[in-house]
Amino acid sequence: MKNMLSAFCLAGTALLCSCILPCEAAAAETAQTIKMNMKARIPALDKLKAQGAIGEANTGLLAVLKDPLSAEDAKTVDAENADRTKIYTAIAKQQGTTVKLVGERRARQIHELAPKGTFLQDEKGNWNRK
């Protein structure tokens, strides 16, 4: 299941980057960079999720559940959230909706595919382990 979620995230990122972000040369390079960076972060993020240090928030972003994270781990989480926000912003612009709504939709997808043991935030803000 963990590999399925990772594969889903990669496939979703690839689709979002290739279809939603503008196709100009600079934007395409940025989309490719985002995709590569997100792929590279998967092992570190999976480890932090398995430890219960981070969870998937109802906003479509990661949340720190156990402070303090190491500086390196905090940087990884911040970078992932920044890239997710860029993708959600591009989708919102393309669909004429809000970044918040795109993130919430993505959170529901992530929650469905998250492996057992992942901390997930429900719509009311409560944290539960799947």
Set out the residue ranges of the language-model regions.
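Alpha-helical transmembrane segments and their juxtamembrane interfaces
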Residues: 12-13, 118
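C-terminal segment of classical bacterial N-terminal signal peptides
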Residues: 15-25
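Contiguous, amphipathic alpha-helical segments that mediate oligomerization or scaffolding
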Residues: 88-89
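Bacterial N-terminal signal peptides that target proteins for export
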Residues: 1-12
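Amphipathic, charged alpha-helical segments and their helix-to-coil junctions
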Residues: 28-75, 79-82, 93-130
